[in-house]
Amino acid sequence: MKQSKMLIPTLREMPSDAQVISHALLMRAGYVRQVSAGIYAYLPLANRVLEKLKNIMREEFDEIGAVELLAPSLLTADLWRESGRYETYGEDLYKLKNRDSSDFILGPTHEETMTSLVRDEITSYKKLPLNVYQIATKFRDEKRPRYGLLRGREFLMKDGYSYHADQDSLDETYLDYKKSYEKIFERAGLNFKPIIADAGAMGGKDSQEFIAITDDRINLEKWLVLSKNITSIDEIPESVLSEIQEELGKWLVAGEDTIVYAEGGDYAANIEMATSQFEPNVAYTEELELEKVATPGAKTIDEVSDFLEIDEEQTVKTLVYHADDELIVILLNGNDQLNEVKLTNRLGASFIEAASEAEVEEKFGAHFGSLGPIGLENVRIIADRKVELIKNAVVGANVDGYHYKNANFGRDFEVEEFVDLRTVNEGEISPDGRGTLKFARGIEIGHIFKLGTRYTEAMNANILDANGRSIPMLMGCYGIGVSRLLSAILEQFARIYVEKTPREEFKFSWSINFPKELAPFDIHLVPVNVKDEAAMELTSELEEKLRGKGYQVLVDDRNERAGVKFADSDLIGLPVRVTIGKKAAEGIVEVKIRATGEVVEINKDELVNTIEILSK
């Protein structure tokens, strides 16, 4: 493929509006262009990478018997009314009317559409299981689209759906997809973790996310590719390393997910779902007499603890939330934070919101800093499990400026139930007891769900089972964010190339280091001077030979300066660059391996073998 025939509009500088490195490099290297806020055009290079990603997915899904189809993006609202999501999905849903004033949506996901198709065609357990998927454009009216392809209004997604007559069949397919996703992300070269996750608006029970880890800013060597005349990072002056660290610091760590994983164990979960083991508070072994004490001006846990000269672990804080139409009181250990996802899931609420200070004062006669569970009537109280283990706690007295000491559950106040409501902290013990918990940031690249009968029951997608009974099908759904996967790959494979000039000066620049299986082309042939007949003849000869060996080759046939060509080649990020320069008449070329920075000068007859050896 001739570069002069392709649309690769590289930029000399990073775009000023980019906040993450993947967005900046996709724009600068000519992979994508923004059409409007949250909407991008995938230019030829990006499209080639996306096609390779799709083909990897197709190969892996063939192995588990998943069949590809294509559903419409313009969907009737009636199906979403059947499932109940038309009213509850929120403002992210694109809603529109046709000329007859009928309601339609642009599909953000296709559970309703697929279930409608299946219920019309399958009525017996004998035709199950069914496992289908599509790779198609989705739409979501993001309030604040940002970070390039990571959070857009239009995006490419692989969404799969399976239908089953029994739980064992659903469990088997769910596991097949988990293994399939792991193979796909491994083939993409990603550092990722499968984690326990919240099902969110999708509904259902079991759910796992696949997160590409993005927060490694400490290991500088990971980011650097050194030129052939630099043998070690130790050769680079501290001043240059500081500049590189400063350059890294310009870019936000991509990914809105915080994951929790066990260092030294297998446990991993989204921060919203993570649990831990914790030691009971053993400051007291027996209950002491309840005592009301003045705490003037002490409103926060820190202030109360300091005033009473006690540890925060000895305090219980009281929160008040609206859960749908009900007011709920929540108790937490003083130094813990409420996990609102856990609370929502436990209550089965469609909506929760913290009560205002005015509402609390009107209802209980005290402000938050002095609120406590003792004496509360006609209100539901639930508490985190950790609260049950606290003896002789300090709690608010429901009178401003006062607290109770030595408050004990069962004697002084009642709780409807103790459940896991807290957000875990780093350093706590993994729930399986294997390792301590660590936090990391990452990008969600895949999500699988066991939906059960969430959609099939609502939409009357029933079958006759082996006993002739009419039952709702069981359902699973399985998504991969294909376009955001492209960004995740760049977040992990962006590199800073460091070179030492003949004058012993150190320079560095950003480049892309695509994994071999995903690069838009395998090899970049760069003739330095397109007016040099010997160079162009050798270029044509090498192109033909390499293509004959199955390599995908991009030839830079542009009449540009060598510096421009090399800069663009570094930006584009193909695994191998072959430079055809002044020694072309002798059949000598230069080979550069992108991943290592290694450069060798060889005879043309050694090119194929050299590439195979150096690329391993």
Swiss-Prot record:
Its EC number is 6.1.1.15. GO terms for cellular component: cytosol. Keywords: Aminoacyl-tRNA synthetase, ATP-binding, Cytoplasm, Ligase, Nucleotide-binding, Protein biosynthesis. It catalyses: tRNA(Pro) + L-proline + ATP = L-prolyl-tRNA(Pro) + AMP + diphosphate. Its main location: cytoplasm. PROSITE patterns: AA_TRNA_LIGASE_II. It is found in: Cytoplasm. GO terms for biological process: prolyl-tRNA aminoacylation. CDD domains: ProRS-INS, ProRS_anticodon_short. Belongs to the class-II aminoacyl-tRNA synthetase family. ProS type 1 subfamily. NCBIfam families: PRK09194.1, proS_fam_II. Catalyzes the attachment of proline to tRNA(Pro) in a two-step reaction: proline is first activated by ATP to form Pro-AMP and then transferred to the acceptor end of tRNA(Pro). As ProRS can inadvertently accommodate and process non-cognate amino acids such as alanine and cysteine, to avoid such errors it has two additional distinct editing activities against alanine. One activity is designated as 'pretransfer' editing and involves the tRNA(Pro)-independent hydrolysis of activated Ala-AMP. Homodimer. This is Proline--tRNA ligase. It comes from Lactococcus lactis subsp. cremoris (strain SK11). The gene is proS.
